[in-house]
Design a protein with these regions (language model features):
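Hydrophobic transmembrane alpha-helices that form the pore/transport pathway of multi-pass ion
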Residues: 1-17, 27, 36, 205-238, ...
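Membrane-interfacial loop-to-helix junctions in multi-pass transporters
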Residues: 1-5, 86-92, 144-151, 176-193, ...
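Core transmembrane alpha-helical segments of multi-pass membrane transporters/permeases
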Residues: 109, 113, 134-171, 185, ...
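Alpha-helical transmembrane segments of multipass membrane proteins
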Residues: 15, 26, 30-34, 99-100, ...
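Membrane-interface helix termini and inter-helical loops of multi-pass transporters
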Residues: 38, 164-180, 288-300
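Long, contiguous bundles of hydrophobic transmembrane helices that form the permeation core
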Residues: 44-146, 250-340, 368, 372
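Alpha-helical transmembrane segments of multi-pass membrane proteins
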Residues: 1-16, 42-45, 51, 185-199, ...
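Short helix-coil transition sites and intra-membrane helix breaks within transmembrane domains
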Residues: 17-23, 148, 162-168, 184, ...
Length: 373
């Protein structure tokens, strides 16, 4: 892979860690407070969007590897999972316990204390991982430092919320966006997205989310009738992707430093890799069933997720310009259109998108088969 692509993969993947359950970014804990639910519920509702995000990255990386003709590591050179799991699998016990306790409704403080105690216990059998007094003190110090940013963000959250309420700034912003959007939800979502991205350029995710959750999220909830969890998740997502969106793209700068690549090109490539993060929030804003909100049937959830997955594949293939062979511009336009069509709620739009993308895939398959004959 080229340096820009490698740096972009690092930036997009690490940024996605904030939206991936079970342990999401600090802003997710603030979201739980804002919405008034347990953190475990936020993590549960974020599963499908996060999986779609990383699936989109995987698809793009795979298509890029196919385009460049890269081959994987031979099977006999891969590390054996079984022996490795037997030797070190017990180290997963604290993480598994933490996830289980969060999902069972334990408070985060209680779950964290129990998981920390388990981490100390499982470190004992191995001399290399054993928590001696020095390591224990260093761990406490690191934990204290890491909690400072969250503690400050929680303190600032109340101040910002108070300022927005007392000065009428929130109502002013609501009136401005609703005035431009009218009753067009897509316009309100787009304006909110732009606000989140612009505000998030260089602003920490937690601070960005606090501001957006107290200003723009109420616009979507009160002005457009969007579900409260979906609205907060919407601003949460776009506050995060601001880290990989040029021209600032702080995560892309970090990735480019590691890969020794051009920061701006790395940011543009990272945006392509993370294209799912720019699309999926619109889907769950219109179809909150993806977040397990207002679910009428399991089939409906499956349909929404599968159509979103195929749509992400279409858009990723269009941006990458390769499926089974190099795609021409006409094929890329059809793939992009098919991908976007699949993300519009409705069976008819799903069928149209499926025909467009499926047609291009079949065309390339038969052309490649004919060329090989």
């Amino acid at each position: 892979y080229q340096g820009e692509f490698a740096g972009a993969v690092e930036a997009a993947s690490s940024t996605g860690g904030q939206i991936m359950p079970p342990i999401m970014g600090a802003a997710a804990f603030l979201m739980a407070e804002m919405v008034g639910v347990q953190y475990g519920e936020i993590a549960m509702r974020a599963i499908f969007p996060a999986l779609l995000y990383f699936t989109g990255i995987f698809i793009t990386v795979h298509l890029e590897a196919k385009r460049l003709g890269l081959k994987g590591i031979p099977k006999d050179e891969l590390p054996k999972f079984g022996p490795l799991f037997v030797r070190q699998g017990y180290l997963l016990i604290p993480l598994v316990a933490l996830v289980a306790m969060v999902m069972m409704g334990y408070t985060m403080s209680r779950a964290a204390i129990i998981a920390t105690a388990l981490a100390i216990l499982v470190s004992m059998p191995n001399k290399e991982t054993r928590m001696n007094p020095t390591r224990f003190i260093n761990a406490l110090e690191a934990g204290g430092k890491n909690t400072l940013s969250v503690a400050v963000a929680c303190g600032v959250a109340g101040i910002i919320a108070g300022v927005v309420t007392m000065t009428g700034l929130g109502q002013l912003l609501i009136s401005a966006i609703v005035g431009v959007a009218g009753d067009r939800v897509i316009v309100a979502l787009f304006l909110t997205m732009l606000t989140c991205i612009v505000l998030g350029m260089g602003v920490p995710t937690t601070a960005n989310y606090i501001i957006m959750a107290t200003t723009c999220a109420p616009i979507l909830v009160n002005g457009m009738g969007i579900n409260k969890i979906a609205a907060n998740m919407f601003v949460f997502y776009f506050g995060i992707v601001a880290d990989i969106t040029p021209p600032v793209a702080l995560a892309a700068y970090a990735g480019s430093a590691i890969a020794k690549s051009n920061p701006m090109k790395t940011g543009i490539t990272a945006t392509k890799l993370a294209i799912a993060a720019f699309i999926v929030p619109y889907i769950f804003a219109y179809s909150p069933a993806m977040l397990f909100v207002n679910v009428t049937s399991v089939f409906k959830v499956i349909q929404i997720v599968l159509s979103a997955l195929l749509g992400i594949f279409g858009v990723a293939a269009a941006l990458n310009g390769y499926i089974l062979r190099k795609s021409n511009w006409f094929e890329r336009i059809l793939l992009f259109a098919g991908g976007l069509t699949l993300m519009i709620p409705g069976t008819i739009s799903d069928l149209i998108g499926l025909v467009l993308i499926g047609g291009i895939v079949l065309l390339q398959y038969f052309q490649r088969k004919k060329a090989a004959a």
